């Protein structure tokens, strides 16, 4: 008789959905007020001039202008600012 033994079960095969984090607008780019600049977990980038920080640490533009990334302070933190055009 032709028999096929039952296949075993596995405990693998799951993965969480990607969260699409990262820099959405880069330095020198023009961004409108309310535009998302960085989606992040925690404060990898800190808000500078004319940049707001959301509840989930998303950085967004408070005014229209060009994006400027800078490293400053004694701890060499990365700041994102908007320079008005």
From Swiss-Prot:
UniProt keyword terms in alphabetical order: Ribonucleoprotein, Ribosomal protein
Key word rRNA processing present: no
Classification via InterPro entries: Ribosomal_bL27, Ribosomal_bL27_CS
Entry's Gene Ontology BP terms: translation
Gene Ontology terms, MF aspect: structural constituent of ribosome
Entry keyword annotation includes Hydrolase: no
Gene3D superfamilies listed in its UniProt record: 2.40.50.100
Cellular component aspect of the GO annotation: cytosolic large ribosomal subunit
Recorded superkingdom: Bacteria
PANTHER family cross-referenced by the UniProt entry: LARGE RIBOSOMAL SUBUNIT PROTEIN BL27M, RIBOSOMAL PROTEIN L27
Classification via NCBIfam families: L27
Family under the similarity heading: Belongs to the bacterial ribosomal protein bL27 family.
Protein name in the entry: Large ribosomal subunit protein bL27
Source organism: Sodalis glossinidius (strain morsitans)
